[in-house]
Every structure is written in C-alpha cells, then in structure tokens.
Amino acid sequence: MTRMVTESTPSPVTVAPPVPARLYVAGALRLAVAAGIALIFFLPVLWMLSISFKPPAEWLEYPPTLWPKEPLAGNYTFLFNPGNPEGAIAVMTGAAEPVVPAFANSLVVAPLATLLSVTIGFLAAYAVSRFHVGGTFMPFFTLTTRMFPPVAFAVPLLLYYSAVIPRLIPGLRLYDTRLGLILMYVAFTVAFALWMTKGFIDAVPRHIEEAAILDGASRWRVLFTVTVPLVRGGLAATTLFIFILTWTEFLFALIFTQRFAITVPVQVSHYAGAIGRFYGPQAALGILASIPVVVTGYLIQRHLVTGFTFGLVRE
Amino acid sequence: MTDAPPIIRLRHLRKEFDGTIAVADLTLDVAEGEFICFLGPSGCGKTTTLRMIAGLERPTAGEIWLRERRIDPLPPQQRGVGFVFQNYALFWHMSAYDNLAFGLRVRGVSPAEVDARVREVAESLELTPVLRQRASRLDLSAMQRVALGRTLVVQPQVLLLDEPLNNFRPGLREVMRGELKRMQLSLGRTMVYVTHDQEEAMTMGDRVLVMHEGRVEQVATPREIYRRPATLFVAGFIGRPAMNFIETQYQVEDGRAFLRHDALRWEIETRREAVERQAPSGRVIVGIRPEDIRPAVLAVPEGRRGETLPVQVDLVQPLARRKIVDVKVLDLVLKMVVPGTFRVDAGQTLDVVMDRGALHLFDPQTLRAIG
C-alpha cells in the first residue's frame, strides 16, 4: 500500500464544548412539556394504583383522590385468597376464584403464542420479501383477514373447537385449554407479525445477504447470522406488540375458556358480588397484570432503540 | 495489455429475464492484472454481466471461463472471484474483524488460520487499528477497505466491483476513486468495475467496455473510446457536453466528395472510399465534438482547417475554465467550447471553423462509425 487516506483512526475522546445558557433553558422547557405529556398518559395508571390500595368505602368517592385515606393491602391479598375476606374488605363476598391459575395460564399462553406468531410471521415475511412467495397480492391478503371483526369468527370457531376437532382428532382438546388459546392467538396475530417484520426485512439491502451467499453461506446461515441481527430492533418491536395483544386479549379468552384455561383479562371481569363491582381487586389485578408487559418492554428496550444504524449510506 | 492468455473469457453470454433481454451476446477477454470498466446507462446489462461472472445470476446461454476452468456451472464460492457491492453491503452489525473473517469461517477454515489471514489482509489495507470497531461505525474510507478486504481475504483471482462509489457525494467520490485505483495498482489484481459514470470509467479503466441495451457498443482504451467512437451511441454518450450530430447527404461536386447539409458542406475526399462502401444510401450522420468547433480567431492547424463559418451566438454558459456556447447556423443548434478567457456574448455573430480531422461519420442505418 503506498498512500492511503489516514483519517481512519478516530480521535479517542471528544470533549464536549461548553453549552450556552439558552440551550439549558430550551432543554428545561422541553423536559417540562415532556413531563406534562407523560403525566396525562400516566394518570389512569396512577389512579388504578391508588384504588388498588383503597378500601371499598373509598372506591367510588367523588371527587376522586389520589391518596387513599386508609391504605390497605387487602385488595392484593384478596386476589390470592378470596375465600373469607376480613376487616375493611369483609363486604367482598360471593366472588371469584384465586388468581394464580389465571396468571399461570396467561404466563404460558401469551409468551408461547407471541414466540410462535413472531417466528412464523418473520419466516413468512422473509419468504415474501426475498422470494416473492405468493405474488404481489399475498401480503395484502393476509392483512385483509384481519379486517373481519373477530366476533364474526367467534361462534363458528367455537363450534369447530367443541364439535369438529374432538371428532376428527379424538384426544385433542382445544376448548378451554391453553393449547386452544395459543393456536387461536397465533392465527389471529401472525398477519400483524408478518407485516411488521416485512417492513424491517425490506429495509435490509439484498446485497448484504448476497455478500454472504457469495462466500458460500447457506440461506439459513445468512438468515441467522446476517439478517436476524440486522432486524433485531424490528423483531423486538414486533414481539412487544404481539405480546401486548395476546396478554390482554379478552373476547376469545372469554368465549373459548370456561374454567381451566381462564386468562388474566377474563379473571379481571370476575370481580363482582353483593356490593357490585369489586374495583379494588380489579385495580390490584390490573397493576399485577401490567408488570409482565413492563418487564418485557424493559428487557427488549435496548433492541428497540438500536436497530437501524446502517442508514449511513442509502440503498 | 500483455500477451499472456486472458484470465477471464466470456463467450456469447446471454441473459433473459421473463422474456426481456438483459444481455444479448457478450464475448470478451480480460487480461491478467487489467482494470476493465463496464460503462453504460442504467439497465444496459452491465451489472447483470458482472453478477453472472460472480454467480449471482445464471446465464441463459453462453460460457464463462476463469483461466482454464469453466466457472458458469459452479456455485459462487467455488469460482475464485470476489465481489464488492454498491454501498459495500458490509455486515453492519459485526466488527471489521468479523466482516473480514466471515468468508473464511463459512468455508470452514481453522480459527488459527482465519486469524492469521485476517490480520495479514488488515495489515496490507491499514485496517489493523480499527479491527474491533463495528462496521457501521467506520469512516467511509475504512468501509471501502473492509469491503475490499472481505473479498481479498479468500484470495480471489479476480475482483468484481459493482458501482462501489455510487452513492457518495461528489468530491468524496474523487478521493475514493483515487484510493481504489492506488489499491488496484499495488495489489496488481484483475478488476472488473461497473459504473454508469463516464468520468470514473475513463479515468480508472485500462480499457472500457461500453454497453447499451444489452449489447456491447465498443471495447477499447479510454483514449480510443473518446477519439474513435465505434457507434453513434458511444459518440453521444462519451464526452461532456455531448457531441453534435448533423444529418448530411453524400455528394460529388466537380470530382470532389462532400457531405452536405443545406448550405453547409464538408469535404471528405480522404474518406470518400469508406463512405461510398459503408453508406451506399448516401446518408451520413456527421458528429463533431464541441471542443472541435473553434472560433476562427483561435488557431486550428492550417491543413485541417475547414471552411470558416459565420454562426449566431445563442447562449453562453460560463464554467470555471471554459464556456459552453450554443450557436445557431441554418436550422442547427451546435454546442461549442471556448476558453474561459474568450469574450463572446449572446446575439453576436462569430466566425468558427471545424477541425476537419475531428469529424466522426456514422451510418444512420447501422448506427456504426464509417471508416
């Protein structure tokens, strides 16, 4: 090598120049506006949190207050032990079963359905994006299936689950089982997974994959060592989206379960009794039910933020 | 060019996509160590040809030979060719090191040897200091070298480059161009370089192959391409501003041969025989480069001086060191180039002469050069 452009070694440290005062003011203003908007979105959550610690007497107070006058953990303990409420929550009789089975169901159904849906959707999207499988109309067609109101499918599917499947495949139970819900959720979310991931795959220049193919890498190797890492931001976003969808799904969970496969959203609807709705335990369950979503979001947020650093040169 | 047997031989290469012909019938020899540029407008088939050599496209017909081996039936990784993509197509999520190592790892080379060969290539391309950096964080020059290094590490006999400088801003392009050319000289590697940028092709290539609508228009040195364009397309495509074309009729007056357009005429006694043989219809397109039409007051060598011609100056576009002047004569608008210091204004008349030795003649039927 004779001569080469030699600015290739980056300077190790860049010292930030002093920030002018007006930028501080602008920054503070921006922060204030952001905080205000965040508060608006966060208000329902705060309200729910507040109610989850309030005794029945304070649930329907008007105007509502943020701080419980007599805070208690009874709403939470009631979720796990609804048998004989005592003290301030003694009025909450004649209701629900313990929350643990519903939580267990949701914790199995939603992640598995999400994983399956994103995997299938991603592979399908790859086939559509790279090999034009199904022609030009196919991707749109998959989406049109989601334009039917789900309730239009619900009853035929219910009959299919309870009357047809048991005859066709004796021993396979889909009604009121986790498997039944998982299959249903995959079928109903895979079109979203396909569409979301397809956009990200389309954004990966084909040439990058061809470069690997030229070296003799198999399609699968290209997929997992080149494409997947480049779209992982998109996969993370899709996963979170589908997880929220399945974790909180209510209609099918209500219709296709009865006792054994009840999920958290259905469980939330079960809190009512002699005194009407049990807002406290509902709020408490709402708080608990939010935790897995928040945790999931937190775990993958690193991937959500990274992702497309290859916008440096346009394709 | 050497007398050694060619390293690449393309024989009657053809590629069709769903009935449209991308490459019609391409035969070419590339010499060892040569830098050959495929030049043409987009869609002319140059990239398709390159991809066929690499094995990314399968030819509809024809053969590709690398030295003594016919490679067109082989999968890409067995062909011994390296490919540098537009925008480099690096594995942006990997380090420079992993980019360089990828091809070796896929081929199952032992880790110790992978390391040795990556370090060797990195050293020769001055990439050692940035090996641990992510590809997406490298500066453009380093990206270019990683893209080259990634292909060099598997020791290809030929490097294929597909518009590697396409999306860089002007200015940077020229820097990168120089850097690439230097690399080619120091590596001594045979390179096939695809571009639609004539300046790039003309400055970098030992030879240039001009393609148009799937066909080879001309293969020659840049100088030859400019001075003796083989077809009307090449004549119009190469050179800025583009060559002027004038439709003329062949005539013999008083025993002397002329090409005539209305009241204009050019004596072509020396090329008479070629015109009569190759353009029997008598219709000839005369091409003349803007730089070969000059103000009469500026010298043209006496023997080659055509007739002085008064023209009307229509438009003057000053550039840094020269001016592009549109002039009208009869029903023609011709472009000419004058030095930046030459004073000329729109509306004035100007006496010009055309360099008779610089006339290019084309047959309007075959679109090929005459003589």
For every predicted segment, state its role.
Chain B
Residues 76-82, 86, 90-233:
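ABC ATPase nucleotide-binding domains
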Residues 39-41:
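The feature captures the beta-strand-to-loop junction immediately N-terminal to the Walker
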Residues 227, 256-258, 262-314, 342-371:
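Glycine/charge-rich catalytic "coupling/switch" loops of P-loop NTPases
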